């Protein structure tokens, strides 16, 4: 089968390619797992203009431009929004819901009802902050959420705050050299019974880490989010009445609050992340609304990906001690909806993603009503990366260290190392494109496969690091077989992928939606120019070289379609061979500040607004 596909790839008409010049409607089917919403999201390609490969526009103008900049090109139409009829077909009730005239995407101050005293603070200006997220580096990681929860916790601690991070103690959780000690137990009523967890407490880089030890809920095979029927070796047909994700994370949310009581730490701020922790604000507003221990506590909820909502049967509400109306959303219990409604502040991981989920029902995934109902809005705060962890000058997992001044030499050495590792032709002058992500439809893997032929035709190479389903893996293997020496692949590995970033000239990241994204920030740090779609945080973090050749640090695909990606790749190859433009673009990318410091400033300002304190936080 793989050999047959490889032969098809070599035929004149690419077996994956879109018809050139045609408007394409792409309907991703998003498999979100247990407790998730799974809509079909139509995304349409806009009109496309012919490619011009001529200089002086080094990265290839889409059309001749009157502007003085050698990189300038008029912005091609962004992917067209679907017509109202398309929205009605998706969900007539949602389509009929108009957006508010004043967009609730804002960073405005939150109304303060209770002025906060400093009695709970360790010292003047410092806050007791509880961070609640289902995963965190270095203990457990399945995705970017773990990086963000860890970096935010350590960053706030480094600024003088007393930070407590609460995690479930999963079976495959790593202790990371932290010595955990038993600190008592917490008990939570669920469905007429009482569930109890041991509290294990340790310290990691200044952060108090609390593990909830509940073997039945968390110490099971298959990872943090494995369904119970999977852990028991049962089929999906046998799952009815067995799966317990609603109880596992309903317990987690309330147990995190009870842990603070046992440890006698009154939190000033509780910062919950994604649906797994989204019930914490709801517990504060219902079960604990008259509890003096949490009387001065304020809550914030950060939405990392609104597609993951924690949607269950409405009976879940009663099991956790809520009225059904409190969790009800379109006939089911929805944890994310409850958190959006009850949190004192709601943020998400980039300004553009905040706009998308509030203003566009397709991105809101059915939660546009509670989002728009928040009078103070939704604030977008971009994620950062750790500049110490991701530093090509010190990274132990790359072939040669380098900085801005010797990036060309360092890149060449790392490129040769990766080419040798993957069996690619050793060609230092060849533009090297890499992919480092899940090989999924949401990440645009179909467009990447479609465009591989164009990369090879233009004399480039493609290296793919990631993992996908069986069909995707078969297609990847066929691609490598069809283009020996030009296309290589490697399983995704945190250490191995560092060499990809250090070796590459361009990162391909054509996501259909991307709340923030970290790979493009890491790529820029390593002098690799990202090629991205204009969505979510990608639009906030990549400046198109065709619009701003002086400060640009990547290329933005003009529409979500394979032909648009192929044209951006052609632009990239054109610019790569320009003796001045490419080094300048690489320098701009490496000089960019993508650290957590600006975002930590914004989070501290948000906490101050919630607590009603004036002036900067004292450290």
Task: Report residues per predicted region.
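Hydrophobic core
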Residues: 9-14
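Long, low-complexity repeat tracts used as extracellular stalks/passenger repeats
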Residues: 15-121
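Catalytic cores of nucleotide-sugar-dependent glycosyltransferases that transfer UDP/GDP/TDP-activated
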Residues: 117-619
């Amino acid at each position: 089968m793989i050999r047959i596909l490889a032969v098809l790839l070599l035929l004149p008409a690419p077996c994956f390619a879109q018809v050139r010049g045609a408007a394409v409607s792409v309907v991703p089917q998003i498999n979100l797992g247990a407790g998730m919403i799974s809509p079909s999201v139509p995304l349409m390609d806009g009109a496309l203009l012919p490619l011009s490969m001529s200089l002086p526009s080094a990265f290839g103008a889409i059309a001749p431009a009157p502007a003085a900049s050698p990189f300038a090109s008029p912005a091609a139409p962004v992917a067209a929004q679907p017509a109202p009829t398309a929205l009605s077909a998706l969900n007539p009730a949602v389509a009929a819901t108009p957006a508010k005239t004043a967009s609730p995407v804002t960073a405005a101050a939150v109304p303060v009802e209770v002025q906060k005293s400093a009695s709970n603070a360790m010292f003047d200006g410092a806050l007791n902050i509880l961070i609640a997220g289902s995963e965190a580096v270095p203990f457990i990681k399945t995705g970017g959420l773990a990086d963000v929860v860890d970096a935010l916790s350590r960053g706030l601690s480094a600024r003088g705050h007393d930070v407590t991070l609460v995690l479930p103690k999963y079976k495959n959780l790593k202790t990371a050299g932290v010595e955990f000690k038993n600190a008592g137990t917490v008990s939570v009523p669920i469905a007429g019974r009482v569930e109890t967890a041991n509290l294990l407490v340790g310290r990691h880089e200044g952060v108090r880490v609390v593990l909830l030890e509940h073997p039945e809920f968390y110490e099971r095979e298959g990872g943090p989010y494995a369904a119970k029927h999977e852990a028991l070796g049962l089929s999906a047909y046998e799952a009815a009445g067995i799966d317990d994700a609603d109880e596992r994370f309903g317990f987690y949310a309330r147990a995190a609050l009870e842990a603070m009581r046992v440890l006698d730490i009154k939190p000033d701020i509780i910062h919950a992340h994604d649906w797994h922790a989204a019930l914490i604000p709801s517990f504060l507003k219902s079960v604990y609304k008259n509890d003096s221990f949490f009387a001065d506590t304020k809550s914030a909820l950060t939405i990392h990906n609104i597609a993951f909502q924690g949607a269950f049967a409405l009976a879940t509400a009663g099991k956790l001690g809520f009225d059904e109306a409190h969790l009800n959303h379109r006939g089911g219990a929805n944890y994310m909806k409850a958190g959006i409604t009850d949190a004192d502040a709601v943020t998400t991981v980039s300004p553009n993603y905040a706009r998308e989920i509030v203003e566009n029902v397709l991105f809101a995934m059915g939660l546009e009503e509670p989002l728009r109902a928040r009078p103070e809005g939704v604030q977008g705060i971009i994620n950062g990366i750790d500049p110490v962890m991701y530093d090509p000058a010190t990274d132990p997992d790359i072939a040669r260290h380098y900085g801005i001044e010797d990036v060309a030499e360092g890149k060449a050495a790392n490129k040769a190392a990766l080419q040798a590792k993957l069996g690619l032709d050793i060609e230092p002058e060849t533009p090297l494109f890499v992919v480092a992500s899940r090989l999924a439809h949401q990440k645009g893997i179909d467009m990447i496969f479609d465009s591989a032929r164009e990369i090879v035709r233009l004399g480039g190479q493609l290296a793919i690091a990631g993992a996908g389903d069986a069909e995707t893996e078969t297609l990847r293997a066929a691609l490598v077989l069809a283009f020996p020496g030009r296309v290589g692949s490697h399983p995704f590995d945190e250490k191995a992928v560092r060499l990809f970033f250090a070796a590459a000239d361009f990162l391909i990241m054509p996501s259909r939606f991307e709340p923030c994204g970290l790979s493009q920030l890491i790529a820029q740090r390593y002098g690799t120019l990202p090629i991205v779609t204009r969505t979510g945080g990608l639009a906030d973090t990549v400046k198109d070289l065709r619009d701003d050749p002086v400060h640009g640090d990547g290329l933005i695909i003009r529409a979500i379609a394979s032909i648009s990606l192929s044209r951006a790749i052609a632009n990239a190859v054109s610019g790569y061979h320009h003796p001045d433009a490419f080094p300048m673009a690489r320098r701009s990318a490496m000089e960019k500040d993508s650290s957590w410091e600006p975002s930590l400033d914004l989070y501290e300002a948000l906490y101050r607004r919630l607590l009603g304190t004036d002036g900067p936080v004292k450290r």
